From Swiss-Prot:
Its membrane topology: Multi-pass membrane protein
Main location (coarse class): membrane
Species: Arabidopsis thaliana (Mouse-ear cress)
Protein name, entry field: Protein NRT1/ PTR FAMILY 5.12
The keyword Transmembrane belongs to this UniProt entry's keyword annotation: yes
Gene3D superfamilies: MFS general substrate transporter like domains
GO CC annotations on file: plant-type vacuole; plant-type vacuole membrane
Phosphothreonine found at: 108
Gene transcribed to yield this protein: NPF5.12
Record key words, sorted: Membrane, Phosphoprotein, Transmembrane, Transmembrane helix, Transport
Positions of transmembrane segments: 53-73, 83-103, 109-129, 148-168, 190-210, 221-241, 315-335, 357-377, 401-421, 443-463, 482-502, 526-546
GO biological process: one example: response to nematode
Keyword Phosphoprotein on entry: yes
């Protein structure tokens, strides 16, 4: 009996030519030669390009909309941006659980894309609502409350859709590669590199096009373009449906395949606590021969949970130290669309007497660095490293992550030094009390920190994707990628929290805060130095945990 997409958790394996634990869109066993691998992931990558064009068309210049169109202060605007980015990056944990437990990745992609498109449409509508005052009045006192309410509803509807779409699309794309096939297994490592390459194309394009439209034509048009792009993303994804492989989630868990992964993992910890008085000899006979040797205290749970659930809990628990260390990188990651952008808005951005570069467009250098460095990494660095280390990926994923964190430290140091020079230039030209004046210092001074930020992304972000996808059992891979994305989400929350606390602490007794609306009196340089110190601690701990980490599969 064949199965359908809606019931893709089941299926039969009928011959060696079929891909194990995989069916096509009609529910028949997937044929290796006509499905999956690059022919399928190409469609998901194209959908990623269009989706990232939409998302970063909103995210990269959002702080400008908050401060100029809605009249918010720099600190409040930065906090609002961080809260929204954090929500969008944290929601994959929930959607990943729903996809792994109930809907499956394909149906979750369809559902969340509808939320996404509705949110973008509503955002476009909110931007068409005019202000209630003339140019002489302050913007914040005359913005329509209806406009603000619709805007925030739209913004978080976008976050709801984006959070599920991206985690399931990435996991679905990786599912197209069969780990049991040597060639496809090797290609999967390259898949994460080229996926990030494709994503960067979408991000670069929208920063060049959409940000310019928003600041020079209209916000309504600047938000309508991302809405159309998201519609294109859904169309491109559906275009590849006949080539896709749909995971049947095999591996001996048919009886419990719809359990919520959080419930399963929690059940293991509860059972281990209840059976804490049991001796190892009481449980060793119940464990399979391939049981991992780490976190042996969880083996006691096998008395009331099955061995597969115990292994799932061990796999997730082993990721926690790396996840915690990576949160600091998430905080650093939050700075480019917020304070980096505001920093650039005060500097000389003129290309000619009539043309100025939007401050948000400087983020293009992050994307350019990624686009240039990923081919170098994949085609030059990896083969050389592979010949030395004999590892398929050249270096381990944790070595890759550690390298990226180290580069982020240098990026923060450079950002602090450039900000110190910008403040000195403002003082030298008597601009300290002129918040709207252009500091006579070229915005090109910011380019090195953006480029280094992009190179660190190639190491850390791609490494985190591959690490969290590969180190969890197959049935938890949406959740694995959700854990990776939650690093960015919680990093944004932590950044927002830090900004609020520092703003409160440094503005007492009439002092000028680090994040004053007048950036010529503020001290973003102090904040960057603080992040450099925190990143240094994160780097030390990551290297420590990387040395003792036991991979679930050869790296």
């Amino acid at each position: 009996m064949s199965t359908s997409i809606g019931d893709n958790e089941t299926g039969a394996i009928v011959s060696n030519e079929n891909v194990e634990f995989s069916v096509d869109f009609r529910g028949n066993p997937s044929i290796r030669s006509s499905s999956g691998a690059w022919k399928s992931s190409g469609f998901t990558m194209c959908a990623e390009v269009a989706e990232k064009f939409a998302y970063f068309g909103i995210a990269s210049n959002l702080i400008t909309y908050f401060t100029e169109a809605l009249g918010e202060s720099t600190a409040v605007a930065a906090s609002n941006v961080n809260l929204w980015l954090g929500t969008a990056a944290f929601l994959p944990l929930i959607w990943g659980s729903i996809a792994d437990s109930f809907l499956g990745r394909f149906r979750t992609i369809l559902l969340t894309s509808s939320f996404y498109i509705m949110g973008l449409g509503l955002l476009t509508f909110s931007a068409t609502i005019p202000s209630l005052c003339n140019d002489q009045e302050t913007r914040e006192s005359c913005v329509s409350q209806v406009k603000v309410i619709i805007f925030f509803c739209a913004l978080y509807l976008i976050a709801l859709g984006e959070g599920g779409f991206k985690v399931c699309l990435r996991a679905f794309g990786a599912d197209q590669f069969d780990e049991q096939d040597p060639n496809e297994s090797k290609a999967k490592s390259s898949y994460f590199n080229w996926l990030y390459f494709a994503i960067s194309i979408g991000i670069l394009t929208t920063r060049l096009v959409t940000n310019y439209v928003q600041e020079n034509l209209s916000w309504a048009l600047g938000y309508a373009i991302p809405c159309l792009s998201m519609m294109l993303a859904l169309f491109l994804f559906l275009l590849g449906i006949k080539t896709y492989r749909f995971s049947t989630g095999g591996e001996g868990r048919q009886g419990k395949k719809h359990d919520n992964p959080f419930v399963r993992i929690g059940r293991v910890f509860v059972a281990a606590a209840r059976n804490r008085r049991q001796t190892p000899s009481d449980t060793c006979l119940l464990l399979p021969n391939e049981s991992t040797k780490k976190f042996r205290f969880l083996d006691r749970a096998v008395i009331s949970c099955d061995s597969y659930e115990v292994e799932e809990a061990k796999a997730v628990l082993s990721l926690i130290p790396i996840w915690l260390c990576s949160l600091v990188f998430g905080i650093v990651f939050a700075q480019s669309p917020t304070f980096f952008t505001k920093q650039g808005s005060t500097m000389d951005r003129s290309i000619s007497s009539t043309l100025q570069v939007p401050a948000a467009t400087l983020q293009c250098f992050i994307s350019l660095a990624i686009l240039v460095f990923i081919p170098i990494y994949d085609r030059l660095f990896v083969p050389i490293a592979r010949s030395i280390t004999r590892k398929p990926a050249g270096i381990t994923t944790l070595q890759r992550i550690s390298t990226g964190i180290f580069l982020s430290i240098i990026s923060m140091v450079i950002a602090a030094l450039v900000e110190m020079k910008r403040l000195k230039t403002a003082r030298d030209h008597g601009l300290v009390d002129s918040p709207k004046a252009t500091v006579p210092m070229s915005v090109c001074w910011l380019i090195p920190q953006y480029i280094l930020f992009g190179v660190s992304d190639v190491f850390t972000m791609v490494g985190l994707q591959e690490f969290f996808y590969g180190e969890v059992p197959p049935q938890l891979r949406s959740m694995g990628l959700a854990l990776y994305l939650s690093i960015i989400g919680i990093g944004n929350f932590l950044s927002s929290f830090m900004v609020s606390v520092i703003e409160e602490a440094t503005s007492q007794s009439g002092q000028v805060s680090w994040f004053s609306n007048n950036l010529n009196q503020a001290h973003l340089d102090y904040f960057y130095w603080l992040l450099a110190c925190l990143s240094s601690l994160a780097f030390i701990f990551t290297v420590y945990f990387a040395k003792s980490y036991l991979y679930n599969s050869p790296k």
